[in-house]
Amino acid sequence: MLWYIAAGSAIGGVSRYLVGGVVQRAGGSGFPIGTLVVNLTGSFLLGLFLRYAVDTPTLTPEWRAFLTVGFCGGYTTFSTFSYETVALMEDGQWSRAAAYVGLSLVLALAATMLGSSTG
């Protein structure tokens, strides 16, 4: 089981680095759009994967762990979200920090619900 989680985490982490970087460069600086997009797509995927796991009894516990704990856990990042929020506050950008927290929370919940209902 641990190897499945480790492999999923590795793929998720590399995916986060690539997707977050591309989105951040395309979106410009000043707002952590790369991390926001990664966390929203990761929330959607987690909802989708969990719904798929419920609807697909042949999905083994190992592959479920690979997709959810491994890939989604490695792909999404609460620590980076927290750091970027603190950085915005320390820079005096309180409204951006508040918007980032609000958008992250509300949209991540919506993305998870959408993913769950899509599967």
Task: Label the predicted regions.
Residues M1-G119:
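Membrane-interface helix-loop junctions in multi-pass transporters/channels
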